Amino acid sequence: MASFDEAPPGNPKAGEKIFRTKCAQCHTVEKGAGHKQGPNLNGLFGRQSGTTPGYSYSAANKSMAVNWEEKTLYDYLLNPKKYIPGTKMVFPGLKKPQDRADLIAYLKEGTA
């Protein structure tokens, strides 16, 4: 598995397309929007896992105490259930390093 340090540069436009097709069914990035099946991702970077107000997280997600940054998201998005065993997230992950880098680039812009 390539580490985030070896990840290709991300393209936010490509990442937005990935978000719309693979993430938007369960998540939003819109400030002030309610939660969907998954939590609102606005303000994601620098936040600890399991701490978004108003969302009911799994015990595993709360106790893992991951600080969401580019590196942790890169690893998490490869295989969420392996990274946080017991997570409620059903998404199987993004296997391609470029897809993960693109999605993270979009999230950096879209959740700020």
From Swiss-Prot:
Modification note: Binds 1 heme c group covalently per subunit.
One Gene Ontology cellular component annotation held by this UniProt entry: mitochondrial intermembrane space
Native source organism of the sequence: Arabidopsis thaliana (Mouse-ear cress)
Compartmental location: Mitochondrion intermembrane space
Main location: mitochondrion
Chain residues that bind heme c: 23, 26-27, 89
Name used for this protein in its record: Cytochrome c-2
BP term (GO), one: gibberellic acid homeostasis
One GO molecular-function entry: heme binding
Record PROSITE patterns: CYTC
Modified residues (N-acetylalanine): 2
Coiled-coil positions: none
PANTHER family, alphabetized: CYTOCHROME C (PTHR11961)
Origin superkingdom: Eukaryota
Pfam family, any one: Cytochrom_C
Keywords, in A-Z order: Acetylation, Electron transport, Heme, Iron, Metal-binding, Mitochondrion, Respiratory chain, Transport
InterPro entries: Cyt_c-like_dom, Cyt_c-like_dom_sf, Cyt_c_1A/1B
